[in-house]
Amino acid sequence: MSSDFTKEVDKDNIAIITWNCLDKSMNTMTEDGLRSFQQLLTEALSDEKIKGIIITSGKVDFSGGMDLSTLEALKRNSGSDPASKIFDYIMEAHGLLRKIELGRIDDTSKSKPVAFAGSGICAGIGTEIGLACHRRFLSSSKNS
């Protein structure tokens, strides 16, 4: 599992999920990264002690979007039906965004507020993550 995302819980029981691709100059979403993010978000949403969630970046810029090499690998490894494999991946990302929007895992769980704290460039899936959150806090930089 990717370590592009980490989760910590502060003294007020707020979960902070940080996106920080250590081996890249900018955060880009990979297949492992998406699954790691999904797992950490699910853990935070299902933990009754956690009151809310903040999604942020460990870098100056929030995100450069989807890692294009991930899409290429999905296409290359999907056999005779690459569109289906890529569609499944995009729908997995959509499910994650929907979970953020709802602030809960399913219709039976209690909703939690999810906030976005970003700065700098925020492209593609990064923009979608920010828009899925209930509140957005951006730096005053002209690049945000």
Which role does the model predict for each range below?
Residues 1-56:
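Conserved CoA-thioester-binding segment of acyl-CoA-metabolizing enzymes
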Residues 22, 58-60, 141:
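Flexible loop residues that form catalytic
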Residues 28, 63, 125:
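Residues that form or flank phosphate/diphosphate-binding pockets in enzymes
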Residues 40-43, 89-110:
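Catalytic-core regions built around general acid/base machinery
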Residues 48-51, 87, 112:
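Short coil/turn segments at beta-strand junctions that form active-site/ligand-binding loops
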Residues 57-96, 122:
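Glycine- (often His-adjacent) and acidic-residue-rich active-site loop
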Residues 99-144:
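Glycine-rich beta-to-alpha active-site loop
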